[in-house]
């Protein structure tokens, strides 16, 4: 595994390494020692998986308010996504900026620090995404940002066509509560 820093502090793309032989392959997908060396949270409390049927489905932008902010480790088990992370930390140099990373099956993952919103658009049909979380889910602290907020100026690789009602009702980023 190799960690690559991104412009948002604490955000890393993690390149995966497959060890192949005639039986197939072996690949490490979580290495807490490596995360500890970079002082990244890895006290994983729960693990989720989502299945998305259609290419062009957008999920997000989701985050939780204090004290339930969470770090996430996001991995694509099948398919590929455009993963987008927005820095919501008011004191951050990259406040309200975003990073877009193409995450593909067996190639890479993303470590997302606390205080960031997260969303993704599927680039293929039948995607499976898994997530590690380091804090409990608290429905009353769940928040979101509208996926098509003009201020973000996101360049989607695939135009989002399928968005659920909840995600489509979030407010523009200019209305979010600052951390």
Regions found by a protein language model. Name each.
Residues 114-133:
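Ligand-binding loop in jelly-roll beta-barrel domains
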Residues 1-104, 108, 126, 133-179:
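Non-catalytic, conserved peripheral segments adjacent to functional cores
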